Amino acid sequence: MSNDKAKHPMKVGIGGPVGSGKTALIEVLCKKMKTDYQLAVVTNDIYTKEDQQILINAHALESDRIIGVETGGCPHTAIREDVSMNLLAIEELIDKFNNLDIIFIESGGDNLSATFSPELSDWNLYVIDVAAGDKIPRKGGPGITKSDFLIINKIDLAQYVGASLDVMKFDTHTMRNNRPWTFTNLKTGYGIESVINFLREKKLINNKM
């Protein structure tokens, strides 16, 4: 990899409400992609570094490739209005590993209006879960309608919460206007290949820029 590309790894923002599966998604992506790509992660929590520790304990990556940021306030602010702490963490990772391909940036749990600053993220993934109800896609918001890739997680819970996957599929197609998305069950790996293929495609685009 050229020195120029080494200084500009692809940055992937991962947002979504609390408990939707953002950390679980990053864990699976890291485990499946780390043999082909040089990866690192920045996690955001308000008062702790819980998500960082979860990923370390799960051996998603080596511990020094995962940095936890304590935002100390609204998680939306740290990924949109004032991204300085996240940019410092990214800079630290790039200085430490000069051949990084992809950095995943996990936002703190937030609502459907949360979006990443273009300064912080090249591509945005957004995670919602079936347990929140089948009405979530039609509620809209930037995470649903504008994210580069939408993940509807925990499809195995649909039968237990009375959610219709057919309704969610119809509403998602309507709200996203042909933007890519997928159903997932991160416990079994169902749907994850669609996410990985999307990232591989975008990485090829970034390499040409």
From Swiss-Prot:
Q: Which residues form a coiled coil?
A: none
Output the SUPFAM superfamilies linked to this UniProt entry.
P-loop containing nucleoside triphosphate hydrolases
Keyword list (alphabetical) reads:
Chaperone, Cytoplasm, GTP-binding, Nickel insertion, Nucleotide-binding
Q: Name one GO biological process term.
A: urea catabolic process
InterPro entries, alphabetized: CobW/HypB/UreG_nucleotide-bd, P-loop_NTPase, UreG
Major location, coarse class? Answer: cytoplasm
Cite a single GO MF annotation.
GTPase activity
Q: How does it assemble?
A: Homodimer. UreD, UreF and UreG form a complex that acts as a GTP-hydrolysis-dependent molecular chaperone, activating the urease apoprotein by helping to assemble the nickel containing metallocenter of UreC. The UreE protein probably delivers the nickel.
Purpose: Facilitates the functional incorporation of the urease nickel metallocenter. This process requires GTP hydrolysis, probably effectuated by UreG.
PANTHER family associated with the record: UREASE ACCESSORY PROTEIN G
Q: By what name is this protein known?
A: Urease accessory protein UreG
Gene, per the UniProt record: ureG
